[in-house]
Amino acid sequence: MEDDMRKLPERFISFTKAYPEIAAAYETLAGKCRESGPLDERDQTLVKLGVAIGSGLEGSVHSQVRKSLDAGVSPDEIRHAFMLAMTAIGFPKTMATFTWAEDILKDE
């Protein structure tokens, strides 16, 4: 199960195959955004995790949890990000997004 949750979603893979130029342009934009400021990769993933939590989008939460782990953020640090979100987005939304994070973190 762990390998299934850590791999890229089929929807993403099929999109990049169907629209390689758009996918490449998006990756270029993402790279320029990462390079545009002083935050290191680890901090960038935590910021984007917070945005994903606030957006309430399951795919985004899954993606940012995976990227945070890949950047060296510990599972406990990721869980702490969800606790910090609680007072900003409310308990029910935090619980929903935390459930999505645990899809990936439960095997870490």
PLM region spans:
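Mid-chain, well-packed structural core segment of small domains
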Residues: G54-M83
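C-terminal structural segments of small proteins and small subunits
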Residues: R79-D103
